[in-house]
Regions:
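Alpha-helical substrate-recognition element adjacent to the catalytic core
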Residues: 2-161, 252, 256-260
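C-terminal cap/substrate-recognition subdomain and adjoining C-terminal extension
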Residues: 101-130, 134-303
Length: 303
């Protein structure tokens, strides 16, 4: 009598891991983390340029030519460097970044936020920090807080074989900033990678609903709008030394561009930290809900 071969059990379906457990805090730089534009701590003192004169010249030429204000300032800065017969290489610009001064509490902010997210989520969620700035990448490469950031996106010069800045290779202005939100959203964080191909929402590593954008003014409106329209959050900060910045924040609230604003004081226990933590709590709850839903679908064999 022939024996029936043993029945083989069907292999259990491979477990699909839950990977959308990252939140992103995305910062403008000038006026958000620092009281003044980065050039005013670095290049201008080196060249003896009066900030108010330089920015007035940029604004006048932009109005006259109808050109892009960021391209205009980058070109004028190269001309000023040449006129002063200065040699500001990439390395020199990085060194000048040591003169940048931050709002109170910025240096300890990132580690505090990381600890809060890890503790509050029981280790489920990790925080990442990004800079998206119209300022100069060559300066931002030298900032003392750079190691806290996953990526730093900023305008950039081409340097010739003499290490002289010749022309811009990357220009980030108010509206082009938004492409970097989609890079973070899709996990295509290297500038050369295309972000135009369709990617299903479920495959995007950092949903917009897990993002917080922090800025200081009207130049941040495109990023604030995109972030909020796609389910994320936006906060504005104002400089206590500049009363006009508070009025800008009030206008942003009235236009529903932001969720909150606060004084640019990043120290522990201050209003900015409390309001950011409130948003982080919402995102952490979202991630927990999404993870449980993922596990439920796995149980149902629906993944």
């Amino acid at each position: 009598m022939s024996q029936r071969p043993p029945t083989r059990r069907a292999a259990a379906p491979a477990e699909v891991p839950f990977t959308r457990n990252t939140l992103a805090l995305i910062y403008d730089f000038d006026g958000t983390l620092t009281p003044q534009p980065m050039q005013e701590y670095t290049v201008f003192p080196q060249l003896g340029i009066a900030p108010e004169d330089f920015w007035a010249e940029v604004n006048a030429e932009t109005r006259l030519t109808g050109g892009d204000s960021i391209l205009t300032y980058m070109r004028l800065l190269v001309e000023k460097i040449e006129a002063n017969k200065a040699h500001l290489s990439r390395a020199a610009l990085r060194r000048l970044a040591s003169g940048i001064r931050y709002f109170p509490g910025v240096e300890t902010w990132f580690e505090r936020i990381n600890r809060y997210v890890a503790t509050r989520s029981g280790g489920l969620v990790q925080a990442r920090h990004y800079i998206v700035s119209a300022g100069l990448s060559e300066i931002l490469e030298g900032i003392s807080i750079k190691h806290h950031f996953e990526r730093v996106y900023a305008s950039q010069y081409h340097f010739n074989h003499h290490e002289v800045a010749c022309f811009p290779t990357i220009v980030i202005n108010d509206t082009s900033k938004t492409q970097y939100l989609f890079r973070i959203n899709k996990g295509r964080e290297t500038p050369g990678e295309s972000i135009n191909e369709y990617m299903p929402e479920a495959q995007r590593p950092i949903p917009f609903g897990h993002m917080v954008y922090l800025g200081d003014g009207l130049t941040d409106v495109p990023c604030m709008t995109v972030t909020k329209n796609y389910g994320g959050f936006a906060i504005a900060v104002h400089n206590p030394a500049n009363p006009a910045s508070l009025e800008v924040c009030r206008a942003l609230v009235a236009a529903e561009r932001i969720d909150y604003f606060a004084l640019a004081d990043y120290r522990s226990g201050r209003k900015l930290e409390k309001r950011v933590r409130t948003i982080l709590d919402v995102i952490i709850a979202r991630v927990a809900f999404e993870r449980e839903k993922h596990l439920f679908k796995a149980e149902m064999g629906a993944l």
